[in-house]
UniProtKB/Swiss-Prot annotation:
Species of provenance: Rickettsia africae (strain ESF-5)
Protein's gene: fmt
Lineage: Bacteria, Pseudomonadati, Pseudomonadota, Alphaproteobacteria, Rickettsiales
GO CC term (a single one): cytosol
Reactions catalysed, as given in the entry: L-methionyl-tRNA(fMet) + (6R)-10-formyltetrahydrofolate = N-formyl-L-methionyl-tRNA(fMet) + (6S)-5,6,7,8-tetrahydrofolate + H(+)
Protein name per Swiss-Prot or TrEMBL: Methionyl-tRNA formyltransferase
Binding site for (6S)-5,6,7,8-tetrahydrofolate: S108, D109, L110, P111
Gene3D superfamilies referenced in this protein's UniProt entry, alphabetically: 3.40.50.12230
Length: 303
């Protein structure tokens, strides 16, 4: 099948690799190179780099909402468009430009976690099951019909990186299965109940509320690493917790109290045992290294 691919980050790479192997990728659309590092050198997106290595034509428009881009897409000899974490809204004229429309990999059990941050919200909400869906896109926000779906259980303390990689690889495999059977698949309309929205994360959301349960705080730590990071303030400095574990233990302490010299913190229910931290503008340290340089005394009440 002849394919136009639209995507940008590492999450989209496994799918493009599969498409290059099994189909004919006619063109790739991705975000423009961005300045990175201290030298602010322009860096291609992971998708741009992969397409470049395979000598696939790459386009980096600043928007899809203009006639020039729509005409360009219409001229590309393709049967279908695949869109994965591209970063731009796809207008109706492009959604309907090819025979089989536009397909999208969405890493959640739709209609749960529609929106920009389904992986993060899955972990933050403490979900124990999830899915990867192949969806035919329409003009709504992740409201299109489901062509194929695979459910799976989540490990209790899965990290964002682990979930990201699992869904990216599973989605790539599911996409190839979908394309192989696309003429025989009966699309399934998403149910109207159970709709939730995985809104984009904000830095403010990362602030830890010690009145929440240790389990919920641990979910936030895993779901917000690396960005924005779950953090607390100490001596007017922001400190991110990169890794921790929760203990289902009863206690009589005020929420936020440091109850040991190993940085175990009393929460609304349970205790959070911190394992890895990062003070702003400093490198990440395990708890032993951190406490050698920053002494957070027992009985301190964190805010």
């Amino acid at each position: 099948m002849k394919v136009i691919f639209m995507g940008t980050p590492e999450f989209a790479v496994p799918a493009l690799k599969k498409l290059i192997t099994h189909h004919e990728v006619k063109a790739v659309f991705t975000q423009q190179p961005k300045a990175k590092g201290r030298g602010l050198n322009l860096a291609k997106s992971p998708i741009h780099q992969l397409a470049f290595e395979h000598q696939i034509p790459v386009y980096t428009p600043s928007t899809l909402r203009n006639d020039e881009i729509i005409n360009l897409i219409n001229k590309v000899n393709a049967d279908i468009i695949v869109v994965i974490a591209y970063g731009f809204i796809v207008p109706k004229a492009i959604l309907e430009a090819k025979k089989y429309g536009c397909l999208n990999i969405h890493p959640s059990d739709l209609p749960r976690h529609r929106g920009a941050a389904p992986l993060q919200r899955t972990i933050i909400e403490g979900d124990r099951k999830s899915s990867v869906c192949i969806m035919r896109m329409d003009t709504g926000l992740d409201t299109g019909d489901i062509l194929m779906k695979e459910d799976f259980d989540l490990e209790e303390r899965i990290t964002l990186e682990e979930l990201h990689n699992k869904c990216a690889n599973l989605g790539a495999e599911l996409l190839i299965k979908t394309l192989a059977n696309i003429d025989n698949i009966v699309p399934i309309t998403q149910p109207s109940d159970g709709v939730t929205y995985a809104h984009k994360l904000t830095k403010e959301e990362g602030k830890i509320n010690w009145h929440e349960s240790a389990y919920k705080i641990d979910c936030k730590i895993r779901g917000m690493n690396p960005w924005p990071g779950a953090y607390f303030s100490y001596n007017d400095k922001i400190i991110k917790i990169l890794e921790a574990e929760y203990l289902n233990a009863d206690h009589h302490f005020t929420s936020g109290t440091v109850i040991s010299d190993k940085l175990e913190i009393a929460c609304g229910s349970g205790i959070l045992r911190v394992k890895k931290l990062q003070q702003e503008s400093k490198k990440a340290l395990n708890i032993e290294e951190f406490l050698r340089g920053t002494n957070i005394l027992k009985d301190t009440v964190l805010k």
